[in-house]
């Protein structure tokens, strides 16, 4: 019988990556609604509530490390009393874009650029989102450049269809098992969801 779980993510792209990661985990989850999607600060302010709610219903949470030192210290900062066993909190180092970049050869083909331009260790990138956008500037495909790269004079940090274009890549091309070879934080996340044992009504 599928294990019912709800999701929590920072944004729409994070949600799609998390859903696809779970779909590829080999586990039979019954995925419910995704909460959050209002940014990292909102997630941080409410993570305690999700941890309390996990007593009655399992949650899988994805957040970005951003500029914090390391995932364990961030988790201790957010949940100083620890995570409930029904709450799986995983941290992308340093942003979810590093997990996308980790499927390097396929992402290079998607952009139409040499594979050698994609970082081999995206978790080591200071700003993987900026790195991804700069790679997209070199794309041979005009539509991809227009979707991912901010338009000249725009005040936005991303292109007009950034989330939509990358969601399409994740759903149609990205494979977690391949990508986790280049991203330790993704590998840890995959193992965590493969081994979690949510229990309804557990206190």
Language model feature labels by segment:
Residues 35-39:
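Conserved helicase motor
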Residues 1-4, 15-33, 44-60, 65-203:
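C-terminal accessory helical subdomains adjacent to catalytic cores in phosphodiester-
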């Amino acid at each position: 019988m599928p294990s019912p779980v709800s999701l929590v993510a920072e944004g729409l792209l994070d949600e799609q990556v998390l859903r696809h990661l779970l779909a590829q985990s080999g586990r039979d989850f019954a995925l419910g609604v995704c909460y959050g999607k209002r940014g990292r600060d909102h997630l941080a302010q409410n993570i305690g509530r999700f941890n309390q709610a996990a007593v009655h219903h399992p949650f899988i949470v994805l957040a970005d490390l951003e500029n914090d030192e390391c995932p364990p210290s961030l988790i201790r900062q957010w949940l100083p009393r620890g995570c409930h066993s029904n709450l799986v909190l995983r941290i992308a180092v340093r942003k979810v874009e590093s997990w996308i970049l980790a499927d390097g050869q396929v992402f290079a083909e998607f952009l139409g650029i040499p594979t050698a331009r994609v970082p081999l260790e995206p978790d080591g990138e200071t700003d993987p989102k900026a790195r991804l956008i700069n790679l997209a500037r070199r794309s041979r495909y005009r539509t991809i450049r227009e979707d991912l790269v901010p338009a000249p004079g725009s005040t936005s940090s991303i292109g007009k269809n950034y989330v939509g274009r990358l969601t399409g890549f994740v759903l149609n091309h990205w494979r977690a098992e391949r990508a986790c070879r280049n991203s330790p934080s993704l590998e840890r996340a995959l193992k965590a969801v493969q081994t979690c044992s949510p229990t309804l009504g557990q206190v």
